Amino acid sequence: INNFEFNTGKAIRLQDASGRYSEFLKSTLDKHIKVKKLKIVLDCGNGATYEIAPNIFWELGHKVISINNKPNGININQSCGAVDVSQLSKKVVDEKADIGFAFDGDGDRLIVVDEKGMEIDGDKIIALFATHLTKLNKTNSKFPVITTVMSNLGFEKYLLNKLKIKLKRSSVGDINVIKEMGKFNSILGGEQSGHIILSNFSKTGDGILAALKVIEIISKNNKTTSKSFRLYESFPQNKVNISYKKVLTKNLKFIENLNKEKLKDKNMRILIRKSGTEPLIRLLVEGRDINKVQEYSKYYEKKIRIKLEK
């Protein structure tokens, strides 16, 4: 490099970052909704939300019980938080809480647990937001909801048939969802795993923000958590991991071809993809009829194994 005249960046430590963030979150709340004061259990996943999340919900008048809020640099996401809600489910039931929120280590994912201890995944959280926005006339078929190829077909049917909203699927990963949201000017997207993107407030996933907005909707509906999320039935799914030993030098064109096969039953869906981290072909079959799901699973598993043996 001959010319050394170029700008360099610098790092600045932001004073009271958590305080500023708290004020931002509070600024997103709808002043026209009287929020119910709830008994909430928070599973912070021994991660980034361990301190700020309990403080925010407490400041808003909720009774807060926190678990997995003692990070030591090693225990992050270890059988807790959005990765594993078993502890949260038990605590919600034991404490007779109204709702439970599970965050992952970096706080960008949210999984909800209702008052009965039942897990509510990202699909159903997005469905709740879509239903709410439809009532407010803030979304329509021109602005689709963006999720990934992993989202349940029952969720897609609910959006289209009940709300008249189209669903568009991206590749797995919240970054891919965000890109598609920008392309289609969408205000709502996310992943089944709990990334929820409310682009009117933030251009990336934010678990605490999503949790606050969930409480708003539950308050407005004046329903329990379980009744608020009683929107649709997820279709049964069957997942099969098919291992292979040979190095796959081909681009696995057969996977693309199998995914393009049109199923006669519109209430069925298949997804076949190569794992990016392990020598596995992942097969997902879902549909309204569990017997057909099992039938299609066996059929496609056999086809894949035959292809891999060639």
Segments predicted by a language model, with ranges:
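Short acidic, glycine/serine/threonine-rich loops at helix termini
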Residues: 51-55, 78-80, 110-116, 155-161, ...
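Short, glycine/acidic-enriched loop or turn micro-motifs at the edges of active sites
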Residues: 46, 105-109, 117, 194, ...
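Short hydrophobic/aromatic-enriched beta-strand-loop microsegments
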Residues: 61-68, 119-124, 164-172
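Phosphate-binding and adjacent anionic-ligand microenvironments
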Residues: 99, 136, 140-310
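Predominant activation on well-ordered alpha-helical scaffold segments within soluble catalytic domains
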Residues: 23-26, 51-58, 86-93, 127-134, ...
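Gly/Ser/Thr-enriched, mixed-charge loops and adjacent short helices
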Residues: 1-95
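Active-site flanking residues adjacent to catalytic metal/cofactor-binding acidic residues
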Residues: 42-45, 103-105, 147, 190
